[in-house]
């Protein structure tokens, strides 16, 4: 009887979550749920960026299957890993981004931490830039991947935008984009799509990238290059052009990498945040903060 009384009393007085409002459904994943609920056979799921066969199955790449086999045969123990993730992954990420013989790699002036996909890398970048470096303003392209805006706002940034797409003719609104970037306050974090711009698919030419880089330098902006589709445009090396251009300039910047698409490892959440600094000592100190 006492237990029954206590239970009823708690039910009547515990209002901890009573006023919590329901959040809107994710616009992309929500479409996927609608697709599954649709009984019609003549339907195509264009919501989430996942490569599937005609039967709706995700194929396993031969390289991924071979890697899985090697790991299984090695019977590696399931102990705790490093806070920064698998160091071998970090080394390969840097090689993929900058090239094996890059000055950035040789000088060790960049640090890489493993992340929960590209989303996790962007979250780590936003937290580092806001809570450690003290940045408060960020700018994303119009349009952009929705999580760019959401993550930076959640981290405490005042998020503005720069025009990217010209709806009238389906091209990059490059002159407007340059004007918008020039108008940004010094220290603004600018999120740039390194290749395969999401969602337009339109990328800068090499000369346009050089113009953007010059404005970043002149205005004292902080670039975060997001690369989620390396190899999907012109090739692994070619798609890293913008990142290597920024590295050669000598400025400090950040790169968020995702391998969800590259290896069809959507659910494994494989990604990394790379921070390019001025020297190895600086990179070590930055890494110590990201690991917090």
Predicted features along the sequence, with ranges:
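Histidine/acidic-residue-rich catalytic or RNA/ligand-binding cores of hydrolases
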Residues: 235-237, 268-269
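Conserved core segment of the aminotransferase class I/II
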Residues: 248-292
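Hydrophobic/aromatic beta-strand patches that form the interior of the parallel beta-sheet core
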Residues: 44-46, 139, 160, 224, ...
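Short, Lys/Arg-enriched N-terminal segments with co-localized hydrophobic residues
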Residues: 1-11
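Conserved core of the PLP fold type I
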Residues: 70, 75-220, 224, 230-232, ...
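N-terminal "arm"/small-domain region of PLP-dependent enzymes with the aminotransferase-like
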Residues: 13-85, 92-95, 99
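Short catalytic/ligand-binding loop motif for oxyanion handling, primarily in non-cytosolic enzymes
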Residues: 52-56, 199-200, 264-265
């Amino acid at each position: 009887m006492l237990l029954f009384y206590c239970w009823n009393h708690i039910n009547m007085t515990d209002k901890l979550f009573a006023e919590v409002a329901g959040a809107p459904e994710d616009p992309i994943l929500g479409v996927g749920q609608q697709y599954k609920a649709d009984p019609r056979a003549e339907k195509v799921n264009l919501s989430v960026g996942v490569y599937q066969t005609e039967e709706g199955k995700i194929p396993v790449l031969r390289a991924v299957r071979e890697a899985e086999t090697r790991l299984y045969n090695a019977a590696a123990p399931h102990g705790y890993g490093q806070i920064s993730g698998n160091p071998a992954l970090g080394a390969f990420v840097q090689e993929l981004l900058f090239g094996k013989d890059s000055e950035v790699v040789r000088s060790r002036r960049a640090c890489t931490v493993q992340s929960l996909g590209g989303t996790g890398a962007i979250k780590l970048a936003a937290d580092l830039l806001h809570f450690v470096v003290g940045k408060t303003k960020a700018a994303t392209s119009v349009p952009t991947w929705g999580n760019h805006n959401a993550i930076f706002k959640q981290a405490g940034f005042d998020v503005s935008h720069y025009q990217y797409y010209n709806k009238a003719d389906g091209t990059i609104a490059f002159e407007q984009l340059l004007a918008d970037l020039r108008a940004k306050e010094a220290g603004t974090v600018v999120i740039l799509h390194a290749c395969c711009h999401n969602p337009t698919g339109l990328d800068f030419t090499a000369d346009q990238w050089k113009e953007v880089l010059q404005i970043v330098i002149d205005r004292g902006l902080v670039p975060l290059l997001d690369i989620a589709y390396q190899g999907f445009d012109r090739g692994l090396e070619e798609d890293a052009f913008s990142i290597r251009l920024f590295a050669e300039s000598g400025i400090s910047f950040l790169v968020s990498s995702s391998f969800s698409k590259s290896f069809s490892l959507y659910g494994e959440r494989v990604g990394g945040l790379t921070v390019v600094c001025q020297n190895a000592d600086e990179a070590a100190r930055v890494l110590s903060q990201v690991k917090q």
